[in-house]
């Protein structure tokens, strides 16, 4: 299912980030060595009333002058108008109505999609009265909230969720292995997809996907059905660098949410960038099976240690993805392209793997006996048993007397023991700790 996008726009300091954080909620950091994943994020998948959508905070600019401010607001609103399914235009109830707000409101009146005009920082009756000037705008869907104090936010989200487009997943898509090809612009995603489909000698049946020209292509490999989600078509003429950078990440995010296996495409000529780290981090956080595909390998000068050096670079930059296989290819020459589908089948098998409870507890008991959890508030942590409760990714529940006291390093230790014992290549593992009365 393609997730709808909700964009928050508005001047600096009107509370966009506060509302964004309020809707996203607090999220546990996965590990400390994950640059770009939990820091400086301005997009997130949110679920409200069992409805998932992608939320974007389009802010973060500090212009030098009022003219520059208006220019930034116009550009920001244009991005939202083109890319989002629902727009939240935030204004400051304390500061009052601003001429720049008025101009953007006039622009948003002409948009043929749901727009909510939201007056923020309305914390009490006095400010409610002061905010009445915003009603002079004469717009529908004008709501007052306090993102900081959670006032009116639920009512706002009731309206937003009701306005989201309804999308469904076909039975064919549910039963197929879905592969997302993601990466920043110019890493060679489009060429890679074309080569991959050509190599498999299939007749592609492209289906328009999102408004950013993503394309879904069905194909068959080794008598198995696959859906290839290609996000390569996002760079179009007349689009700004800001849009390319922001929405290439968002488009990848949408594809990742739909996928089982994510091909994270890197450019061998340019190495690993912060945006690569961001996209890979989201794939891991979303619980997807992953493969690193280093493209344009033909374009660099090589010696006997070139592969080893690049592998070391990836392992250094993506310490938390040490379980992800790496394939070096050239979309231009077709070099090693057959390895991609081989790895897809391998990691997919691990992604849906189930292990028996007896085997799991044999490994679990040995791991606990070999290395005890540190004391929590002076008390010993006891473990009772483990069981697998799900796949995509493999998910395990561990029963203990201190489910709230688990140290992240011990959780990582158990994950590594499970991975080593059961060969969970290419897939993240999820551990859930629950209490049990004795």
UniProtKB/Swiss-Prot annotation:
Residues 4-168, 177-352 form the EngA-type G domain. It comes from the Bacteria. Residues 353-437 form the KH-like domain. GTP 1 binds at residues 10-17, 57-61, 120-123. The keyword Repeat applies. Belongs to the TRAFAC class TrmE-Era-EngA-EngB-Septin-like GTPase superfamily. EngA (Der) GTPase family. HAMAP family: GTPase_Der (MF_00195). Associates with the 50S ribosomal subunit. This is GTPase Der.
């Amino acid at each position: 299912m393609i997730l709808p996008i909700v964009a928050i726009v508005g001047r600096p300091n009107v509370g966009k980030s506060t509302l964004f954080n309020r809707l996203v909620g607090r999220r546990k950091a996965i590990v400390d060595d994950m640059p770009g994943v939990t820091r400086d994020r301005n997009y997130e998948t949110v679920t409200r009333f069992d409805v998932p959508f992608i939320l974007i905070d389009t802010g973060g600019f500090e212009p030098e002058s009022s003219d520059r401010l208006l220019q930034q607001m116009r550009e920001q609103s244009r991005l939202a108008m083109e890319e989002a399914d629902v727009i939240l235009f935030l204004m400051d109830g304390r500061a009052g109505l601003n001429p720049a707000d008025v101009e953007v409101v006039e622009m948003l009146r002409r948009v043929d999609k749901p727009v909510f005009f939201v007056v923020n920082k309305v914390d009490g009756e006095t400010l409610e009265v002061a905010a009445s000037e915003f009603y002079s705008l004469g717009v529908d869907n004008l709501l007052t909230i306090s993102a900081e104090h959670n006032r009116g936010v639920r009512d706002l989200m009731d309206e937003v969720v009701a306005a989201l487009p309804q999308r469904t997943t076909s039975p064919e898509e549910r039963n197929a292995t879905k592969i997302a090809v993601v990466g920043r612009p110019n890493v060679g995603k489009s060429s890679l997809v074309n080569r991959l489909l050509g190599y498999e000698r299939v007749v592609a049946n492209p289906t328009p996907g999102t408004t950013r020209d993503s394309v879904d292509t069905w194909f068959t490999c080794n008598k198995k059905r696959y859906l290839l989600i290609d996000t390569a078509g996002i760079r179009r003429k007349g689009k700004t660098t800001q849009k390319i950078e922001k929405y290439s990440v968002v488009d990848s995010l949408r594809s990742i949410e739909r996928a089982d296996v994510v091909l994270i495409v890197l450019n061998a000529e340019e190495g690993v960038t912060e945006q690569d780290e961001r996209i890979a981090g989201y794939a891991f956080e979303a619980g997807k099976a992953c493969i690193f595909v280093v493209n344009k390998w033909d374009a660099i000068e090589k010696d006997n240690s070139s592969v080893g050096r690049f592998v070391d670079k990836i392992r250094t930059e993506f310490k938390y993805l040490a379980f992800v296989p790496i394939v070096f290819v050239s979309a231009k020459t077709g070099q090693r392209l057959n390895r991609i589908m081989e790895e897809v089948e391998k990691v997919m098998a691990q992604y849906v793997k189930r292990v028996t409870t007896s085997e799991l507890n044999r490994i679990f008991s040995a791991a606990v006996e070999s290395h005890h959890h540190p004391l929590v508030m002076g008390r010993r942590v006891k473990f009772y048993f483990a069981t697998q409760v799900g796949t995509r990714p493999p998910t395990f529940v561990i029963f203990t007397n201190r489910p709230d006291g688990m140290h992240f390093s011990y959780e990582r230790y158990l994950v590594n023991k499970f991975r080593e014992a059961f060969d969970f290549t290419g897939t993240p593992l999820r551990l859930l700790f629950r209490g049990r009365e004795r």
